[in-house]
Amino acid sequence: MATYANLAYFADNGGVIQCVDLNNLKPVWSINGFDDIDATLTIDIENDKPYVYCGNEVDHQGTRGISKIKKIDGLTGEVIWEKEFECESLIGKSAVNGGLMATNVIGKNNIYNMAIFSLARYNGFNKGGMFALNKENGEIIWEKLFDNYMWSSPVDIYDKDGNGYIIQGDSAGYLHLIDGKEGNIKSSVLLNGNIESSPAVFNNVLVVATRNGTIYGVKVK
């Protein structure tokens, strides 16, 4: 769930995106999000107006489908723009879905014009992709393809000059440090298992856990 003033925004497994007034718990608007939505919605404020960024996974669509990434007017529910990406999914009792599973990054400082999304099972069943989209029109500013898919949410960090970097974990256990402006990988470290948790960062230290049950503290420099 994401909130702005008295408004709460959330989505469900059926793909419905909703806005509720917290003062009276009455719905303000709702729209069809196309498929299951697990990634937390994010909010960016432009000219004192909230805009919601979100996207769906590939679940009810079957083994192959579309992840639709949206920018939505937070007051009216109007879709400002929408971008489609074809992704794959493993369905069944042991489902491992693709599409947008990770919460996006709303850029700040020198990447203020970007919303950055990580997609699972994009460009190949076990692969993934990261996309920096222009907040204004949804056009791709840069993209980075990965050999492994990502469920872990990317995290943005900034140096003293305001230069943005993205930290991204993947399904093979790699933790990447990425130049937020250009999308180039600056450094990578291999941990001992699939990274599904999202890193927590304080100053120049990040903490993240793997599916093998290990918690790591990693220094960024």
Residue ranges with predicted function:
Residues 2-221:
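Extracytoplasmic/lumenal domain signature
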